[in-house]
Amino acid sequence: MADKLVPSSPADASEPLFSFGVIADIQYADLEDGYNYQRSRRRYYRHSLIHLQGAIEDWNKESSMPCCVLQLGDIIDGYNAQYKVSEKSLELVMNTFQMLKVPVHHTWGNHEFYNFSRDYLASSKLNSKFLEDQIAQHPETTPSENYYAYHFVPFPKFRFILLDSYDLSVLGIDPSSPKYEQCMKMLREHNPNVELNSPQGLSEPQYVQFNGGFSQEQLNWLNEVLTFSDTNQEKVVIVSHLPIYPEASDSVCLAWNYVDALSIIWSHKCVVCFLAGHTHDGGYSEDPFGVHHVNLEGVIETAPDSQAFGTVHVFPDKMLLKGRGRVPDRIMNYKREEAL
């Protein structure tokens, strides 16, 4: 919608309540440039680190310093595992992040699981759960250790929730485990192809091996947190590697059970924005319930003369995404409260 891309009021010039940075799909590898699986888009494996350095330099000198940065997953490329340099590449990227003056919240994508097991990630620097906020009086809002998700409060009356969109997945877990068997059964029920990464002929093309989903346990937890946020009159931003809204994403990139996640979000009034990566070419749509779904353009497919990151400035009535390079600016107005 065109009206989302133009300033809506003179208040745009006022100071934001707070700001935060967003970046997705860095997918660094010490490799020559290559192409995506369809060989239709170029990938700049080495230059992604230079893009990250540029983003950090920008964030560090912004007048409205971000309170944190959301890293939306796929921090290093799966090729690192083939060359047995996963730990080395991760260390290089994490050392680059050390130059940033604010905390980073990391989500986990498919490329994390091409390189590392879930157990490894849980004890790595990519586990940013230590940054979570807990609601002491409401233990039901404390996440289980069975999935990687948490919530935090960057500013009073705003809550950010990081989801684990590979909670249901055949990636990164022991093939002899019951959960692997359960997830493989689920995948094969929806995808009869020999090549499980192929969506060919599928009525639900999101059921491919490079995607995943949300367990009922995690969805129940999400529902509890959103219930608290409704009661507490908070505005909520949800963060996930995988997108959940078809109008904002290629259907082959959606979370397996995106419908279940949407139905919970739509049963609450507090969610204002859902941020995801994974698609690389970006996407945006406002759903019928006024939730803004933003899929961030991926660093990995961004030419050396461009950029792909953004800063979101948060105001009492809206969020303004100030994009860099191929990330477009967006004005995301909060849905109006229904008249009493």
Curated annotation (Swiss-Prot):
Keywords: Acetylation, Hydrolase, Metal-binding, Zinc. SUPFAM superfamilies: Metallo-dependent phosphatases (SSF56300). Pfam families: Metallophos. The modification N-acetylmethionine is found at residue 1. Zn(2+) 2 binds at residues 74, 110, 241, 278. It is an enzyme of class 3 (hydrolase). Its EC number is 3.6.1.13, 3.6.1.16, 3.6.1.53. Belongs to the ADPRibase-Mn family. Hydrolyzes ADP-ribose, IDP-ribose, CDP-glycerol, CDP-choline and CDP-ethanolamine, but not other non-reducing ADP-sugars or CDP-glucose. May be involved in immune cell signaling as suggested by the second-messenger role of ADP-ribose, which activates TRPM2 as a mediator of oxidative/nitrosative stress. This is Manganese-dependent ADP-ribose/CDP-alcohol diphosphatase. Monomer. It comes from Mus musculus. Its cofactor is Mg(2+). It catalyses: CDP-choline + H2O = phosphocholine + CMP + 2 H(+); ADP-D-ribose + H2O = D-ribose 5-phosphate + AMP + 2 H(+); CDP-glycerol + H2O = sn-glycerol 3-phosphate + CMP + 2 H(+). Zn(2+) 1 binds at residues 25, 27, 74, 280. One of its GO terms (molecular function) is ADP-ribose diphosphatase activity.
